[in-house]
């Protein structure tokens, strides 16, 4: 019998999640049936969507999420022992799968690259950035692109893809450390939205002629201000609204209908799983190539230990992460934190 540890939703969040909202449970997994595999988590992801998605869970359910896992026992010939996979097993140290929802890592994945990037730059956040910018926004050479939460897992990739495509890129972030990071990875203009005297004036200074594309991860009043500075026929990709996820009061009104109407702005929300299958795999391969060529740089916000999953989640929602936030489940994993110069380690104290 394998004893699995699961982080469960003890009670639904009210405002900012707290430790008391989670419960760590240990369960004994049954023997495998034919066609099933036993997975051992190596790296687990925490993402903003989990804050909203948790509303669909029942209290007592395992928290949702993606992980890089290793097959440690198999009764499915398609998934032999030792296979490394992407699994939607949630916050679980071990899980059983019938193989239907598993994905293999790209065959081109080099030994020199951390496997955890399959949860970040060369994974769901990368796909979100890739298609949100290139398909939803339709960014092209010469465009001025604005992205907020720009030092996060999605935003940092958005900005770097935009630079690859010949755009001028403006990024907003919530600390001076993050602003410095954005400048380091090639943003043309970056600012700390928490310290500027006037968001409106800062946006005008960054792009006096306005913005062609706006990749929105934040929502709220920030976005209302941006909409008023969009160019004619501007495009807005609505990826998230993290500024409002923990709100318990009345939400701010949306953007001015007058601005949207007379500037003929196109706004579209989207979710990454629209691009599954071959089209998604092609994008992942291109992202991997850009990483290996040094055209896309990355950082990871790493918290060690499965027991610290709630802490990783809460710190990500508070904006403490630079780059992709994830947890290292097992110290016996194939890539230890610190093995790669782009890792940022934030131990729990």
Curated annotation (Swiss-Prot):
EC class: oxidoreductase
A GO BP entry: lipoxin A4 metabolic process
Protein's cellular compartments: Cytoplasm
Key words, A-Z: Acetylation, Cytoplasm, Fatty acid metabolism, Hydroxylation, Lipid metabolism, NADP, Oxidoreductase, Phosphoprotein, Prostaglandin metabolism
Protein name stated in the entry: Prostaglandin reductase 1
Positions of post-translational N6-acetyllysine modification: 178
Disulfide topology: none
Positions that bind NADP(+): 152-155, 178, 193, 217, 239-245, 270-272, 321
UniProt-listed Enzyme Commission number(s): 1.3.1.48, 1.3.1.74
Annotated InterPro entries: ADH-like_C, ADH_N_2, GroES-like_sf, MDR_fam, NAD(P)-bd_dom_sf, PKS_ER, PTGR1
Family to which the UniProt record says this protein belongs: Belongs to the NADP-dependent oxidoreductase L4BD family.
Reaction catalyzed: 13,14-dihydro-15-oxo-prostaglandin E1 + NADP(+) = 15-oxoprostaglandin E1 + NADPH + H(+); 13,14-dihydro-15-oxo-prostaglandin E2 + NADP(+) = 15-oxoprostaglandin E2 + NADPH + H(+); 13,14-dihydro-15-oxo-prostaglandin F1alpha + NADP(+) = 15-oxoprostaglandin F1alpha + NADPH + H(+); 13,14-dihydro-15-oxo-PGF2alpha + NADP(+) = 15-oxoprostaglandin F2alpha + NADPH + H(+)
Residues annotated with N6-(2-hydroxyisobutyryl)lysine modification: 178
Modified sites of kind Phosphoserine: 20
Lineage of origin: Eukaryota, Metazoa, Chordata, Craniata, Vertebrata
Sites of Phosphothreonine modification: 18
Top-level taxon of the source organism: Eukaryota
Cellular component terms per the entry's GO annotation: cytoplasm
Oligomer status and interactors: Monomer or homodimer.
GO MF terms, alphabetically ordered: 13-lipoxin reductase activity; 15-oxoprostaglandin 13-oxidase [NAD(P)+] activity; 2-alkenal reductase (NADPH) activity; leukotriene B4 12-hydroxy dehydrogenase activity
Task performed by this protein: NAD(P)H-dependent oxidoreductase involved in metabolic inactivation of pro- and anti-inflammatory eicosanoids: prostaglandins (PG), leukotrienes (LT) and lipoxins (LX). Catalyzes with high efficiency the reduction of the 13,14 double bond of 15-oxoPGs, including 15-oxo-PGE1, 15-oxo-PGE2, 15-oxo-PGF1-alpha and 15-oxo-PGF2-alpha. Catalyzes with lower efficiency the oxidation of the hydroxyl group at C12 of LTB4 and its derivatives, converting them into biologically less active 12-oxo-LTB4 metabolites.
CDD domains the record matches: leukotriene_B4_DH_like
